[in-house]
Swiss-Prot record:
Protein name: Adenine phosphoribosyltransferase
Cell compartment(s), UniProt: Cytoplasm
Lineage: Bacteria, Pseudomonadati, Pseudomonadota, Alphaproteobacteria, Hyphomicrobiales
Catalytic activity: AMP + diphosphate = 5-phospho-alpha-D-ribose 1-diphosphate + adenine
Species for this entry: Nitrobacter hamburgensis (strain DSM 10229 / NCIMB 13809 / X14)
Keyword list, A-Z: Cytoplasm, Glycosyltransferase, Purine salvage, Transferase
Role: Catalyzes a salvage reaction resulting in the formation of AMP, that is energically less costly than de novo synthesis.
Length: 179
């Protein structure tokens, strides 16, 4: 069994959630398996081990779990990217595309200094709307977005390709067809 097969086996798939025709990939089972969680984090950070990474930015909410672990492994700071209205200090905000409409995300205006090297982390990339918004937000405040990392890629939905088109290298650990 390959590493990817092993990781895929630790992800629960829930059909028709949150709506009919969607195969929901639930990583809580991977997070609850100490060995799978450790291996996933180790593989996410592997390309940057020994590199100068200043901050890891995690997208709410599962990106906080993974991003915190990745930041720890890289001896980097952690920056939460949150839904609008959830942060107590002065923020910078960016609108992003959802499947039906738009929303806004924000981060503290002083969370990242201009030129700091940042890795973006979330659990899954599908259409890429949220990740694209996060990259734009990070660049708006002057971050050097080194890469974006995800446990799961849904390549049929084109999100990773969208980030590649923005000159952001993408690291994923496994892919599932469909959506």
């Amino acid at each position: 069994m390959t590493f990817e097969d092993d990781l895929q086996a630790s992800v629960r798939t829930i059909p028709d959630y949150p709506k009919p025709g969607v195969m929901f990939r639930d990583i809580t089972t991977l997070l609850g398996d100490a060995r799978a969680f450790r291996r996933a984090v180790d593989q996410l950070v592997h390309p940057w081990a020994g590199s100068k990474i200043d901050k890891v930015a995690g997208i709410e909410a599962r990106g906080f779990i993974l991003g915190g672990a990745v930041a720890h492994q890289l001896s980097a700071g952690f920056v939460p990217i949150r839904k609008k209205g959830k942060l107590p200090h002065q923020t910078v905000r960016m609108a992003y595309a959802l499947e039906y409409g738009t929303d806004e995300m924000e981060m503290h205006v002083d969370a990242i200094a201009k030129g700091e090297r940042v890795i973006l982390v979330d659990d899954l990339i599908a259409t890429g709307g949220t990740a694209e918004g996060a990259v734009k937000l990070l660049r708006q405040i002057g971050a050097d977005v080194v890469a974006a990392c995800f446990i799961i890629d849904l390549p049929d939905l084109g999100g990773a390709a969208k980030l590649h088109a923005m000159d952001v290298p993408v690291r994923t650990l496994m892919a599932f067809g469909g959506h």
